[in-house]
Amino acid sequence: QQTESRFIFKNIITPEDKFTFTICNPPFHSSQDEATKSTVRKINNLESRSAGSKVIKPILNFGGHNAELWCEGGELGFVTQMIYESAKYPMQCLWFTTLVSKKENLSSLYKTLSKVNAVEIKTIDMAQGQKTSRIVAWTFLSEAQQKAWKF
């Protein structure tokens, strides 16, 4: 468990650790207010499709506790920090991966991955119903190092 909330991998990945991959479902929102408005919008959309009524106060949080739904900087800030931290463990993890909900964040994330010298970057698009998101994966290992990877 992370003991310092401002970090993602520090104190979690130790010098003797080796991981085939990490996976992250980052906080999407940058504030409690933004998370609440998003929840209200989702509930209203669901209600308008089924019963035609409007819900004013959110009852559900759509799959997370408050601390999991938002953080300062939102999805872009969280994943950017994750990328910078991942660069401190280049030989300890074959692939770092994260969900990216907001397509407009991709350009900035790709620039950050370039800054930290990620060797390979992959984006996997996903769609379910009207929701489109993607998984972004990166590695600091060369093709030869990837093939030689042993867990």
Predicted feature locations:
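Mobile active-site "lid"/loop adjacent to the S-adenosyl-L-methionine
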Residues: 20, 26-77
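Class I S-adenosyl-L-methionine
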Residues: 102-151
